[in-house]
Amino acid sequence: MLAKNPERHFHLIARCRRIIGFLSSTFVGVFYRFRYETPIDWSKPYIICANHTSNLDITALVLLCPSDFSFMGKIELLNNPVTGMFFKTIDIPLNRQSRISAFKAFKRADDNLRKGRSMVIFPEGHIGEEFPPHLYDFKNGPFKLAIETQVPIIPIVIHNAWKIFWDEAKTFGSRPGIIHVQVLEPIVTSGLGLEHADRLRDDVHQLIKKHWTKAGGL
């Protein structure tokens, strides 16, 4: 019923996602500890950019953000029985092999932001296969979107999710534990033009890498 009109029921679907994330994590003994560099006014929209080393990163950000938001992610997430529920309703699938798909996805993201909803985008675009993981180069899309909408970016450092659950637990298994998430100060984009997108991308990458490396991924 909710899926028939996701726009109308956006808030309720987002709450269901949050409840599922909390219950599923609690059931397997995975908890999240959030550390804020500065208080966040969640009544405003943001583009949330985090490093991506584990599927648990998704749950971490679901539990972090109390306001309505959408993920943008690879189109394959439509085929997952859990993420598929939300990528068919409130989240935004992206097929990077199709310019039309990419245009439509970022148009939806733009609309969301202008409605006051945040966007969560993993700027690396994928989880790497190397173990231990490292921070890959960032895609330009989130940063161009932030400039076009003049919405602040919140850099997020997810320190140790990969140590608890990596590679779908095929190689090293999984274990209970506490995932440490660092919420950095929002980066204001007001006054920036698209000519600043590359610099903004590199600044966010360096910031996340600095804090992740400093903590040793712990």
Task: Identify the residue ranges that each predicted region occupies.
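A generic structural signal for alpha->beta connector loops
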Residues: 29-31, 68, 90, 150
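Generic preference for hydrophobic
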Residues: 34, 48, 71, 121, ...
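A short, well-structured juxtamembrane/interface segment
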Residues: 23-46
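N-terminal nucleotide/polyanion-binding subdomain common to many enzyme families
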Residues: 16-22
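Catalytic core of membrane glycerolipid acyltransferases/transacylases, capturing the structured
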Residues: 1-16, 42-99
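Short gly/ser/thr-rich secondary-structure transition/capping motifs
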Residues: 27-35, 102-103, 163-166
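Non-catalytic C-terminal accessory region of glycerolipid acyltransferases
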Residues: 104-218
